[in-house]
Amino acid sequence: MKCPFCAFADSKVVDSRPDKEGSTIRRRRECESCSKRFTTHERVEEILPLVIKKDGRREPFDRMKLVAGVMKACEKRPVSVETIERLIDRLEVQMQESGEKEIPSKSLGEWVMTELHAIDQVAYVRFASVYRSFKDITEFMSELQELLKK
């Protein structure tokens, strides 16, 4: 592992442990050149299904794209980055367990909205407003009315 401080190519692992969910491994490393310590988080590379977009295109699942969308919905809300990461981790596990080779973006969006509804209702409405592409204020108000009923 390349040192982020001096760019030396070799480092030794000082400590290694799985995270709480067991999906990543946290490693504490020490550079063999400058002796500075740094942390890495390693994840097993999994083959996730292709996402079928609304227009029929297929593209590989992009975790960072989904994280960015959820983070935008949670902007200035009391939702931690860790909560968002766990939400996306659960989604990836669900995708793996489904065994599907392709999954519609609609299914991913609905699942994220269900999760956000339980975490933060303002973030839910923000995500839904982009995901569902409300055509006018009436559709938006209808969604808010449904939220208030729950």
UniProtKB/Swiss-Prot annotation:
InterPro entries: ATP-cone_dom, NrdR-like_N, RNR_NrdR-like. The keyword Transcription regulation applies. PROSITE patterns: ATP_CONE. Disulfide bonds: none annotated. A zinc finger (unnamed) spans 3-34. The keyword Repressor applies. Its cofactor is Zn(2+). Binds 1 zinc ion. It comes from the Bacteria. One of its GO terms (molecular function) is ATP binding. Residues 49-139 form the ATP-cone domain. GO terms for biological process: negative regulation of DNA-templated transcription. Keywords: ATP-binding, DNA-binding, Metal-binding, Nucleotide-binding, Repressor, Transcription, Transcription regulation, Zinc, Zinc-finger. Transmembrane segments: none annotated. Belongs to the NrdR family. Negatively regulates transcription of bacterial ribonucleotide reductase nrd genes and operons by binding to NrdR-boxes. HAMAP family: NrdR. This is Transcriptional repressor NrdR. It comes from Geotalea daltonii (strain DSM 22248 / JCM 15807 / FRC-32). The gene is nrdR.
